[in-house]
């Protein structure tokens, strides 16, 4: 089993979803917890286009009304980290992914700084 954590941005997005969408997303999150970085299409895919991140991925699922995507990566602590989620239905694909990746890069940068601070504080406490 892989550890999974999430950003405040992801958590806020998830709370806006209807029950059908929440179930669809949780289905993929449970697969991610089980398979970790080995989870592949059609459940997960690599996100290309980031100049900063080589290991950015997306969880993929859809309902009758929504095409759901959750950006995630494996952080420096080797945990799956859910970054943000969006509904792709009716969106321009290039713009959708450009915005998703840009937002993900900002969240990753902040998250990695927090992890580094935690490591420093832990080492200072020894």
Positions of PLM-derived features:
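Basic, Lys/Arg-enriched alpha-helical interface segments
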Residues: 1-67, 76-80, 87-126
């Amino acid at each position: 089993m892989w550890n999974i954590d999430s950003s405040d941005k992801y958590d806020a997005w998830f709370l806006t979803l209807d029950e059908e969408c929440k179930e669809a997303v949780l289905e993929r999150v449970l697969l991610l917890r089980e398979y970790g970085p080995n989870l592949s299409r059609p459940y997960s895919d690599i996100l290309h286009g980031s100049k900063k991140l080589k290991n950015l991925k997306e969880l993929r699922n859809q309902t009758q009304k929504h095409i759901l995507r959750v950006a995630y990566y494996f952080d420096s602590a080797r945990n799956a980290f859910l970054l943000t989620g969006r509904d792709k239905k009716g969106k321009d694909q290039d713009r959708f992914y450009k915005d998703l990746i840009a937002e993900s890069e900002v969240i990753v940068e902040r998250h990695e700084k927090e992890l580094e601070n935690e490591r420093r504080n832990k080492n200072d406490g020894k």
